[in-house]
Amino acid sequence: MASKRWCFTLNYKTALERETFISLFSRDELNYFVCGDEIAPTTGQKHLQGYVSMKKLIRLGGLKKKFGSIAHWEIAKGDDFQNRDYCTKETLIAEIGAPVKKGSNRRKIMEIYEEDPEEMKLRDPDTALRCKAKKLREEYCSEVSVFSLRPWQIELHRALMEVPDDRTIIWAYGPDGGEGKSTFAKELIKYGWFYTAGGKTQDILYMYAQDPERNIAFDVPRCSSEMMNYQAMEMMKNRVFASTKYRPVDLCIRKKVHLIVFANVAPDPTKLSEDRIVIINC
């Protein structure tokens, strides 16, 4: 039978034997570990009484393979605190991590996900999906990109060094494709920018409302050029808008942000005021 929570008893003769056994427990593989020394009152035998909460399910055979066959193992009863009290009633020898009461929310959701992603997918698929997305985003943002900036990218970078206002929309226009628009847009994600390929107004506003102080990058695919969402752009740039999807909220934000549109088409002058647009030709 497999379990994450086990208790053990290890009879030993020397301190070296005891310490060698304890050293086998890795912080990366467990949530909590504690052990204490005891001496049997009738025989005088020294033994280590311990408890471990592993991150993954493990069977008795797996424990013996990992920690050797000299210890006696049983599936633990009670919570972390109860097992800690039992194991340390005479002497505390070693402790890794912190005990958690049964049903406690002290441990972070991400830690629970990383212990057993498949279990969380079954129990709470929505939370598991968000955890997976967060992990993938962290990995993406940690990757170092090396490339030479093109002239238009240098011009755009200089524009972004200016203090943003509540009107200007920067339009990176490249009709041919392959100019590096999407490459630049995706790189901005690593600097905390909100990235969107467009879509329905309320879908965009709902996602942006999660953190509405971010700079904004619209990376519009060629196939969506005829459905450019000028409404969402202007609402987000104005810093006052309502997100009505799922959790309705009215947002009034003081912080001004940059908004860039990366597109294969020029802006439609009938949809946005001409003085709003700063075009950078790619």
Curated annotation (Swiss-Prot):
Protein's name in the database: Para-Rep C2
Domain (CRESS-DNA virus Rep endonuclease): residue spans on this chain: 1-99
Top-level taxon of origin: Viruses
Positions of short motif RCR-2: 47-49
Note: The genome of nanoviruses is composed of six to eight segments. In addition, some isolates contain subviral DNAs.
Cofactor note: Divalent metal cations, possibly Mg(2+) or Mn(2+).
Family from the record: Belongs to the nanoviridea/circoviridae replication-associated protein family.
Purpose: Initiates and terminates the replication only of its own subviral DNA molecule. The closed circular ssDNA genome is first converted to a superhelical dsDNA. Rep binds a specific hairpin at the genome origin of replication. Introduces an endonucleolytic nick within the intergenic region of the genome, thereby initiating the rolling circle replication (RCR). Following cleavage, binds covalently to the 5'-phosphate of DNA as a tyrosyl ester. The cleavage gives rise to a free 3'-OH that serves as a primer for the cellular DNA polymerase.
Catalytic activity entry: ATP + H2O = ADP + phosphate + H(+)
